[in-house]
Design a protein with these regions (language model features):
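Cysteine-nucleophile protease catalytic domains, especially the papain-like/related folds used
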Residues: 3-86
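Hydrophobic side chains in beta-strands
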Residues: 43, 107, 124, 161-162
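An almost-null, non-specific background feature
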Residues: 46-50, 114, 138
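...with weaker cross-activation on analogous glycine-rich loops/strands in unrelated enzymes
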Residues: 64-136
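Active-site or metal-binding loop neighborhoods of secreted/extracellular toxin and effector enzymes
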Residues: 127-164
Length: 164
C-alpha cells in the first residue's frame, strides 16, 4: 500500500476495526456490496473490496496470486491484523474472552490440485457466531460452530482471538 488513497483507506479501516462492530452499517447497499466475510471478521465496514483478501492489507499477497497452504493463510492473516494494529492469537471455541476481544474462525476450501481456492471467516462476539457472505446481510449462526460446518466442503483452519 503506497498511494495516498491507500493510506487513507487503511486509516479508515484501522479506525473502524478498533470499535465494536455496528451491524446496522450493513443495512446500506454500498457497505453490503463492497465488503465480505474477511472485512466482517476484522470489523471493517469501509468500502474497499480489493483489500479484503488475506494478505492484501499488509501488501504481502498480490490479488491474482493463489494461496499455497493453510500456514501461508495464517501468516498473512497475522500480518494483515498487525497492519491495522489488532492483536491476534490462537484460541478455541471454549476460551472466554474479554469485552475488548472477539474471535474469528478461518475456513478454507481445498480442491483436487491441493491449492486453496477460497476462504471463509466467521465472527464470535456477544456470545454468538455470525458470518457475512459477499453482498448479503450478516447472518447469525448460533452459540457454536460445531454443527454449522459438518456439511460444508470447508475445512476449519483455526479459531483466533482478536484484541482491539
Amino acid at each position: 500500500m503506497t498511494s495516498t488513497n491507500d493510506v487513507l483507506l487503511l486509516d479508515r479501516i484501522r479506525e473502524t476495526t478498533h470499535q465494536k462492530l455496528d451491524k446496522t452499517r450493513y443495512d446500506t447497499t454500498l457497505v453490503r456490496n463492497t465488503t465480505n466475510c474477511y472485512s466482517y471478521a476484522m470489523g471493517s465496514t469501509v468500502s474497499c473490496l480489493n483489500l479484503y483478501r488475506v494478505g492484501a492489507i499488509s501488501g504481502r499477497k498480490p490479488l491474482e496470486e493463489p494461496y499455497f497452504s493453510t500456514g501461508e493463510n495464517i501468516k498473512l492473516l497475522y500480518e494483515d491484523f498487525k497492519e491495522i494494529d489488532l492483536t491476534i492469537e490462537r484460541s478455541s471455541e471454549e476460551e472466554v474472552i474479554s469485552e475488548n476481544q472477539y474471535k474469528i474462525a478461518l475456513f478454507v476450501k481445498v480442491y483436487a490440485d491441493n491449492k486453496i481456492h477460497d476462504f471463509h471467516f466467521t465472527r464470535f462476539e456477544d456470545g454468538r457466531w455470525s458470518e457475512k457472505f459477499r453482498w448479503q446481510l450478516p447472518r447469525d449462526i448460533g452459540t457454536s460452530l460445531k454443527n454449522e460446518y459438518n456439511y460444508w466442503p470447508w475445512r476449519l483452519v483455526g479459531i483466533f482471538k482478536v484484541t482491539r
